[in-house]
Amino acid sequence: MIGRLRGVLTSKTPPWLVVDVCGVGYELEVPMSTFYELPNVGYEVNLFTHYTQKDDSAALYGFLSESERRLFRHLQRVSGIGTKIALAVLSSVSVDTFAGLIQAGDVNALTVIPGIGKKTAERMLVELRDRAADFNNGISTSGKLNLDTVSEAALALQQLGYKPAEAARMARDAGTESDDVASVIKKALQAALR
């Protein structure tokens, strides 16, 4: 259907966007990880898209990378996971981190993601383990990020006034596998000041 859009960003209200392509405004829903990486209104954007139609409604979803869109599609093939949980996954962790969690079989880390309980996490592991390489080429599990540390850092950033999705993105981007909560918070705040 519609595989990619390139146009001017005319509206931006989480998690919705409107992209003007030759005078036609396309409304898209995007994961928060994509939302916070977008330029300001009035600038050109290039998004990979996924179109869905169910009964009497249609929706268009946008992603900054092909790997995000691939993961979104793979997640929806898992029994019991729809677009809402797929977007929550992409809003919470990067494709690399998610692929590493699947390959490592880390149920506990997956349950930190909003909307994913233990049964859903176990089902994801079973159904996605063989396909992890499909949604991300060159996955490395050695640099596994501790999601408990990231979650705690994100909560602390929220207490400092950051919105939940922005705090999660900041903590995720700042953390490395050897960081403790204080280090992640410090790095996230330093990055925000740049």
UniProtKB/Swiss-Prot annotation:
It comes from Xylella fastidiosa (strain 9a5c). Residues 140-144 are annotated as: Flexible linker. Belongs to the RuvA family. Its main location: cytoplasm. Residues 65-140 are annotated as: Domain II. GO terms for biological process: DNA recombination; DNA repair. The keyword Transit peptide does not apply. Pfam families: HHH_5, RuvA_C, RuvA_N. SMART domains: HhH1 (SM00278). This is Holliday junction branch migration complex subunit RuvA. The gene is ruvA.
